[in-house]
Curated annotation (Swiss-Prot):
Protein name as it appears in the record: Photosystem II reaction center protein Z
Record's bilayer topology term: Multi-pass membrane protein
Family statement: Belongs to the PsbZ family.
Classification via SUPFAM superfamilies: PsbZ-like
Gene for this chain: psbZ
Organism (species): Stigeoclonium helveticum (Green alga)
Source species taxonomy: Eukaryota, Viridiplantae, Chlorophyta, core chlorophytes, Chlorophyceae
Amino acid sequence: MTSIFQLTLFALILFSFVLVVGVPVVFALPNGWTENKRIVLSGLGLWILLVFVVGILNSFVV
């Protein structure tokens, strides 16, 4: 269970870094938001899901 938690936490950290870099790039493009709105919102949804999964797995590890 600990390894699953660690992999999920690593995925959350990696995906957070991708969003921190990617979202400002999307907003900086001339038509970035209108063209990539679905990708940004999907990424946000996946990030929220990862936060909840890490929280649930944390209760089993500790």
